[in-house]
Amino acid sequence: TEFEHYLKKAGINPKDLAKIEKEQPELFSKLTSDDPKSVRSRAKKLTALRKKGYMEGKLGMIIDGTGHNVGKIEKQKRELGLQGYDTYMVFVNTTLDVALERNSKRDRVLPEKIVTQSWKDVQKNIGRFQQIFENNFVIVDNSDTLDEKQATKKFSTYVKKYADKWAKSPIKNPMGKFWVKKQLQLKNAMGK
């Protein structure tokens, strides 16, 4: 991730993040604060710029997140919808024990209390996500394997399966349909 990239650039091993929170809370706060110069803020800015570029080019994208902030997801869905995108959600669920175990084996280990609170928030949000995405929402369980490589492969398989299915389906968003129609008219007018 961009956050991990900037941590490494600052000379910090992402695996040490949980340790830093416990042993050097001031540094942890400095790294993760909303200060525009913080590692977290710079990473968020880069992510936002990349997303903007994709949206300007009307390119498809997969947005990966924890889902602990339902308002953020709802806002992203609304913004994308206004740009003509059809939006879908693959909700990859796991047990808390598995989430904690996987976290301990990640390159960037988060403090256990953050993982636990985030997991609880996500579980509370499942129903709301179903309301927001309606028929464009699917839940898959990825709790049965702890090995990070296997879990990542399974996750990728799930996402690819649904992303391929949805990408091949006709555009439903009226603004998206209009944009495609205009692009085809431009293409035809240019004789291509």
Regions found by a protein language model. Name each.
Residues 74-80, 104:
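"Short basic amphipathic alpha-helical interaction patches in structured regions
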Residues 1-59, 71:
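Conserved substrate/cofactor phosphate-moiety recognition/catalytic segment
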Residues 57-61, 86-88:
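Loop/turn-to-beta-strand initiation segments
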Residues 96-192:
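Conserved GTP-binding G-domain of TRAFAC-class P-loop NTPases and closely related GTPase folds
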Residues 1-3, 92-94, 141-143:
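Short loop/turn segments at strand-loop or loop-helix junctions that form parts
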